[in-house]
């Protein structure tokens, strides 16, 4: 088996986000619908025999040992008892604080890559359980299927939904998830709904009004995108998105947006590009 491996870490969108209540431990009960994008970071791994975990790519403002990639590698190392280590390089394309899962996706890709490189043989459930300790969004990336999520986001029901093209606008802000969920004006009493209701269009993102109020850049991006398509915030933001039936229409609207707005066009996918790549390795 090769000691080197390169894998993608795909972005995700929250197609809606309803907050049902707040638990005694401070976490929020929610419902959301995750779908992947064929766009993301790229990670490169090379196994080491001395047990060291080294991330060779610096992320501004994130200490090496606090990076989710390093925490994922060390967590798997400890839980599995593997004596092996790894060198990791990251091609970072996804924004931090964007609501499209950059850090969680990187962590999930790390877990799956090292399960393969270190020949651990862990099953999907065991990897997802370890991923949940790193963050509520990590399991959806380790499982790799579009899903209706409940609880704090960890109860996942796979779904088969349309796979449109998306135009994603990336405002230049770093949104604090903790800040949004602690805002006293955040809606916390949305009624539970079914997936069918979401697909019929009766849903929203409960975080969006709070984010728009706190971050004018996000509000302005929504105003601009709403001129061409129904736009919505993903997660706690700050990325916003609109869906299109084909790439040509998404590209057309992208070309009409101001040059200063960062954005990208990507296809939605119910099976993540990470898992499609992993299937070719088996």
From Swiss-Prot:
InterPro entries in alphabetical order: GHMP_kinase_C_dom, GHMP_kinase_C_sf, GHMP_kinase_N_dom, IspE, Ribosomal_Su5_D2-typ_SF, Ribsml_uS5_D2-typ_fold_subgr
Pathway: Isoprenoid biosynthesis; isopentenyl diphosphate biosynthesis via DXP pathway; isopentenyl diphosphate from 1-deoxy-D-xylulose 5-phosphate: step 3/6
EC number: 2.7.1.148
GO molecular function, one term: 4-(cytidine 5'-diphospho)-2-C-methyl-D-erythritol kinase activity
Catalytic residue list: 12, 137
EC main group: transferase
One of the protein's GO biological processes: terpenoid biosynthetic process
Gene3D superfamilies (alphabetical): 3.30.230.10, GHMP kinase, C-terminal domain
Catalysis performed (reactions): 4-CDP-2-C-methyl-D-erythritol + ATP = 4-CDP-2-C-methyl-D-erythritol 2-phosphate + ADP + H(+)
UniProt entry keywords in alphabetical sequence: ATP-binding, Isoprene biosynthesis, Kinase, Nucleotide-binding, Transferase
Residues that hold ATP according to the record: 95-105
Function according to Swiss-Prot or TrEMBL: Catalyzes the phosphorylation of the position 2 hydroxy group of 4-diphosphocytidyl-2C-methyl-D-erythritol.
Family: Belongs to the GHMP kinase family. IspE subfamily.
Protein name according to UniProt: 4-diphosphocytidyl-2-C-methyl-D-erythritol kinase
